[in-house]
Amino acid sequence: MKIILTGATGFVGCSLVPLLHQQGHELTLLVRSVSKAQRLFAPGSFPQLKAIAYEATKSGDWQKVVDGQDAVINLAGEPISERWTEAYKAEIFDSRKLGTEKLVEAIAKADRKPQVMISGSAIGYYGTSETATFTESSKPGDDFLAEVCQAWENAAHQVEQLGVRLVVFRIGIVLGADGGALAKMLPPFKLFAGGPLGSGEQWFSWIDRRDLIALIDKALTDSTLRGTYNATAPNPVKMKEFCHTLGKVLARPSWLPVPDIALELLLGEGAKLVLEGQEVLPGAISKTDFQFQAPDLETSLRQILGS
């Protein structure tokens, strides 16, 4: 297949691209920095890959490369783990909403349109709660990230009017050793100073990065996948259980909680995502034949950390 990707140099994309290339697909990466893409994916090792510079929120010549592609994978968006100033919140919103709108605009202009578009979203769609359990049919929340996700998904759904199959993944907290939440939590645990963030009672709806990549890979060719799917493992845990399990796998204690105020100073409004959380279940995925490689947390952490 000829596949165009955004967000290819991010935490998920860095593992997705090698898999797709190994399968023999022709990959076009839309990136802000071609040099960064070439450092990550050396031309000698990735002969069927090309990187094209683009500004995600603006129309431009880059849109022409969408013509003739078989699939579009849209994972771009500013990281939400930075401190949320008002200016940065605008970047979080625009990079997702406008970035997706410009991709759909490019598809609309294409003479030969892709068969499928796979677009990221997040479980932040549901807002946060310590008591509710969310599935794909649950109503959206009303906080900032819920607003972002709704706008992001609404932009993606426009592609369906063009006859393109759309798969939206509401992605949970992605676990992998070299990035994301786990990489930030490992150092204090290894120094015997790990512990739960905040009260520890908040839900932590996670997914192993390998399972997320497998879901994206399946969505490329399985025409029965259509619509919205929660990309989370079937066994979410509370933060205190996550930290206890991480300590067990590392043979380290989980005894030193990080107080709310420290996270609020570090992340500002974004601390709410860590301190409140949500319990999200992959109801739609459970009705497919997809099999999780890491359905439970300890299995995932042991595979990731090699213990």
Swiss-Prot record:
Name of a matching Pfam family: DUF1731
Say which domain of life the source belongs to: Bacteria
InterPro entries (UniProt xref): DUF1731, Epimerase_deHydtase, NAD(P)-bd_dom_sf, SDR39U1
What the record says about family reads: Belongs to the NAD(P)-dependent epimerase/dehydratase family. SDR39U1 subfamily.
Q: What is this protein called?
A: Epimerase family protein slr1223
Q: Which organism is it from?
A: Synechocystis sp. (strain ATCC 27184 / PCC 6803 / Kazusa)
